[in-house]
């Protein structure tokens, strides 16, 4: 095949690696390609294969719950990389959100072209009609863009307005989706209506595939894990506590001193120390991302070179310093890596 010959020839003529060290942006682009392209495409097929296997073995059709999600630390791995910090965390989260919403917009547009059912030929669920009327009222400009000859195509009309709402979500405007669950609710409404009104072979399969993708990728594409060395935390704490010998103190002593800060009973003073301010910015960014990108956008906070419980308390205390608080607790999944360089 000429295409195989061409690909192999071009590959042999290309260096295995660039002599230029990749930037954080290069790494993010590389990982983002696989998340938003091959993995995005194959996730529904994986669920379908698993459902078919379960039915083949047990003879029962099952609706699978969410089984799969993805995570990355590109843009969030600060350990030993001075180019990674609050700015790259924010940029990665925003880029991933834009990527996945753009894919949803394309899929919704394709569904709108496919689902051309007219009210004179087949009924739709009353709840779908109510949702359509609600969206027409909330997004009059988008509703006015629907062609008059499509006015009696409820699925197409609703999907057009879903696409408009996704565009508002992309721009983080008020009428956009607050969470991917709201998008799932709209798509599930369409899927249920199709199944109830002779649509099993008239588009339900394609809607189910998009539902599967939204469950897996949300509005974040992949959770962003964050990692930092415990010694960087110690540097910041030494400045905040005014204790130059902080890092060399016994783990039990450090834990005892950190408990009131980790629980919120005590507060660190303001500091202009570089280590303290950079970590404060990281935790503030993680706090803000929960509001702008959803609670699923960020994953683990990984502590490399952890030695004791004091290192976990250090992260809790620093997170409070950065304002990452929900109620009385710190909404952070901390994963200490107990390791040494020996």
Language model regions located:
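Extended, charge-enriched "interface" segments that sit outside catalytic cores
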Residues: 1-15, 114-292
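A nucleotide- and high-energy phosphate-metabolite-utilizing enzyme signature
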Residues: 23, 50, 71-74, 78-82, ...
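Extended, Lys/Arg-enriched charged tracts that mediate electrostatic binding to polyanionic substrates
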Residues: 24-69
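Short acidic, Pro/Gly- and aromatic-enriched capping/linker segments at domain boundaries
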Residues: 53-79, 198-211
């Amino acid at each position: 095949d000429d295409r195989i010959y061409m690909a192999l020839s071009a590959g042999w003529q290309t260096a295995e690696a660039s002599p230029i060290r990749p930037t954080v942006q290069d790494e993010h682009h590389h990982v983002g390609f696989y998340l938003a392209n091959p993995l995005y495409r194959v996730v529904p097929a994986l669920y379908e294969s698993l459902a078919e296997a379960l039915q083949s073995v047990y003879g029962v059709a099952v609706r699978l719950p969410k089984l799969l999600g993805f995570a990355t630390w590109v843009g969030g791995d600060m350990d030993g990389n001075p180019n990674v910090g609050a700015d790259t965390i924010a940029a990665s989260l925003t880029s991933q959100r834009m990527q996945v919403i753009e894919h949803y917009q394309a899929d919704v547009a394709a569904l709108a072209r496919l689902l051309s059912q007219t009210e004179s030929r087949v009924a739709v669920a009353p709840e779908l009609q109510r949702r359509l009327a609600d969206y027409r009222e909330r997004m009059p400009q988008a509703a006015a863009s629907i062609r008059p000859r499509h006015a009696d195509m409820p699925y197409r009309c609703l999907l057009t307005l879903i696409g408009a709402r996704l565009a508002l979500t992309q721009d983080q405007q008020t009428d956009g989706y607050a969470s991917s669950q709201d998008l799932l609710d709209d798509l599930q409404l369409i899927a249920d209506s199709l199944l109830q009104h002779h649509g099993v072979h008239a588009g339900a399969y394609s809607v189910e595939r998009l539902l599967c993708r939204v469950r897996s990728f949300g509005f974040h594409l992949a959770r962003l894990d964050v990692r930092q060395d415990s010694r960087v935390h110690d540097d910041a704490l030494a400045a905040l506590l005014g204790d130059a010998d902080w890092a060399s103190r016994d783990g039990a002593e450090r834990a005892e001193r950190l408990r009131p800060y980790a629980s919120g009973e005590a507060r660190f003073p303001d500091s202009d120390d570089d280590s303290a301010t950079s970590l404060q910015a990281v935790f503030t960014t993680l706090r803000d991302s929960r509001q702008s990108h959803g609670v699923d956008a960020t994953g683990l906070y990984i502590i490399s070179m952890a030695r004791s419980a004091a290192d976990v308390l250090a992260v809790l205390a620093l997170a409070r310093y950065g304002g990452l608080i929900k109620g009385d607790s710190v909404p952070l999944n901390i994963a200490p890596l107990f390791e040494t360089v020996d």
